[in-house]
Structures are given as C-alpha cells and as structure tokens.
Amino acid sequence: MRSFIDQQGDAALCAIGVMVIGTASSYLWNAYMPVYVERQLHLPMKWALFGTFVASSMNFVLFPFAGKLMDRFGAYRLFYPVVITWAVCTLPLFWFIVSAPSGGKLLTAQIIAALFQVAIAAGHPGMLATLFPAHARTTGVALSYNLAVTLFGGMAPLTVTLLTQQTGSRFVPAFYVIAAALISLALVRFTRTGQAALAADRAHRAQRAKVATLPAFPAD
C-alpha cells in the first residue's frame, strides 16, 4: 500500500476529486431528499420519492447521450464548466424549493438536479480508467471510488443532518454540495494527474478538429 501511495497517490487524489461532487449530489438528492422534504419542508414524502423515481428514469435514458458528449468533447474539458455551473445553481435551486414549498417546485428542482448529475457522472468511468496505469488501475479505481463515496456520499445524510441541527438552516444541503464542488475542482485542477488529463483532452480535441479539416480524397 505504501508503494501504491508513493507511486499513484497523486492520481488517487485526482480520482477522488472526480467522484466527490457526483456522489455528494447523488446521495443528497436521492437518499436524503425524502427526509429533508418531510422534516424541513413539511411535505408528504411521496413527492420526494416520486421525484427520485423520475430522476432515476432520466438517468437511465440520458446517460448514453451524455457519455457520447464526453467522448466527443472530452470529459475533463466538460468537467470544470459543468461542476462550476452546478455549484452556482445549487443555492438558488434550494431557495426556489424552500421559499414556498410545493410538490411541483420539488419535482422541478429534482429534474434540474438530475440533469446536472447525469452531466457530471456520465464521464466517471472513462475519467477514472485513464488516471492509472494498467498494473495499478483496479487498485486505484477501487480505493479512490470507495473513499470518495464513503466519506462524501454515504456520510452526507448524517453530516447534513448534524449541521442542520446545529445551525437550524434549511440551506445546509446546498452548502454541502457547494463545498463538495470546490473540493472536486481543487483536487482535479491542482494535481499533476488532473492537469495532464486536461491537457490530453485538449490535445485529442485539437487532433480531431485537425483531421476534420483535412480534404477527403476519393478512393481509387
């Protein structure tokens, strides 16, 4: 394990960064939302469960198309604008729900959140696979994925519940997502592996654009 950390520690940090915002958003909007709706918004839990069903159905339908976009434009090139936009939209989205809670508003917010979750998570498999060399890929992906999901996903409902009890604010979930986004951006942007992955995405995109401009010659 020490050898792995010495050789692949930077890549593991980048991989954790890739996962943090996606897993935090998923657990909050899917696992924690029914509790939030009932305790904080005082709406029937059925609204949150229905929204979760709609969001899951959207994931099933949209993931292939989102993955295609990642392949075309580069998952790391799209990661930054998507995560930044999601962080900016999160607080207004919760304000939209909290200001006058209703089933319709909740469903609208869950649909918007689902679109961002698809855009963020669709690139995860490809992004993680390219970070580690073949001899360390399984260990690297497994370790990074499980650490990120456990600390920032599985612990999210407990963390948000405790912070809500301490602060009394109904906007704690929004600030949790924003914090997760900042952690993701920092770990991907400021690791050598993340910088190299972004450069590779840009180079691949430039090569595709160059090939597209070449004249086509008819076959003999």
Q: What are the roles of these predicted feature ranges?
A:
Residues 9-58, 152-157:
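Extracytoplasmic gate region of multi-pass secondary transporters
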